[in-house]
Amino acid sequence: MAILQLKNLNKTFSPKVIPVKDISLSVEDSEFLTLLGPSGCGKSTTLRMIAGLEEVTRGKIFLGTEDITYKRAGDRNMAMVFQSYALYPHMTVRENLASGLKLKKVPSGEIQTRVTEVAELLGLEDLFQRKPGQLSGGQRQRVAVGRALVRKAEAYLLDEPLSNLDALLRERVRADIKQIFAAQKAPVVYVTHDQTEAMTLSSQVAVLNNGYVQQLAPPADIYNHPANLFVAGFVGSPQMNLLTIPCKGNSAMLGDFSITLPKFSSSPPQIVLGIRPEHVRVALPEDTQTVKGRVYLVENLGMYKLVSVRVASSQTEPPTLRALLPPDQNWDNEEITLALPSENIHWFDVESGDVFQ
């Protein structure tokens, strides 16, 4: 197998439309890289350039030592799974699995062997004689994945393959994809806007916005150590609390309460405090960094209640904190004291949005 590399990749449709800006990535053998971001961030355009379906404006794409930047899509030895499944409606499952190999004139005996192996892996043997219209969404998705696997490609590309499935089925197929591609020993590039897919499937996540890679790191690092405000706000559900607050000496003021700042090289007039709702908890007597406020909204999530609190403040518009709290208490309209542990607080620059240092 081979390493997939993107070097300073750019795509320009017009002077004002530049969806991909100077992206450099490397995907090792057996590595599962997810391109994660909102609509219009450049993730699908990047995938299409890797596949050869979109022309590169500037930059290079390597598969192993070979420069494939301008190589025809059909000659790249990559396999792609599309959002729309792209199955032939007039063909049976067996014929769909074999179709790509027949076009490449693979010997019939080898086609039979590969199709049988993949069908056993994906549990498709009993569906061989059915056509796509006779399959469920999950079954069609497995056939689409199977069409990619029979190729025995040097790299696999998946473009939002679960977006057409309902939530329960998406969870099951997600687990299948993780197991299946872990066994392929090839680079995998997966595109999604769904952070749950990105966090559960990936060995590396590249968070994209406005054509740029905002952060490239393992999922745990993306979640626990976001590089900037965009990553902090985009990854995580419920969303991280992000509050722009004034600084006073070595402290920041959250409402009427003082939050100790780390030892920064400079003291800004304002700073953005970030803390995830699961890290905000009911204060204990020994907690030293606390804020008080009143609950104004409670959302029951089953295992937790998402509680929104207006922090006590002399300001006209008091800041709001959200906390994930135990479900066995009625928090409605309660006065509450919350602890904000220093080790769970992130600080961001107001101007650049980057982590403040």
Feature map (PLM): residue ranges:
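A short, flexible loop at the N-terminus of ABC-type nucleotide-binding domains that lies
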Residues: M1-L6, K11-D22, K71-R72
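ABC ATPase nucleotide-binding domain
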Residues: Q5, S26, F62, T337-A339
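Pre-Walker A (P-loop) beta-loop-beta motif of ABC nucleotide-binding domains
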Residues: I23-T34
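The feature captures the beta-strand-to-loop junction immediately N-terminal to the Walker
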Residues: L36-P38
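Helix-to-loop junction immediately C-terminal to a conserved catalytic motif
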Residues: A51
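Conserved ABC transporter NBD signature motif
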Residues: G59-D67
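ABC ATPase nucleotide-binding domains
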Residues: K71-F230
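Non-catalytic connector elements of ABC transporters
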Residues: P238, N250-Q357
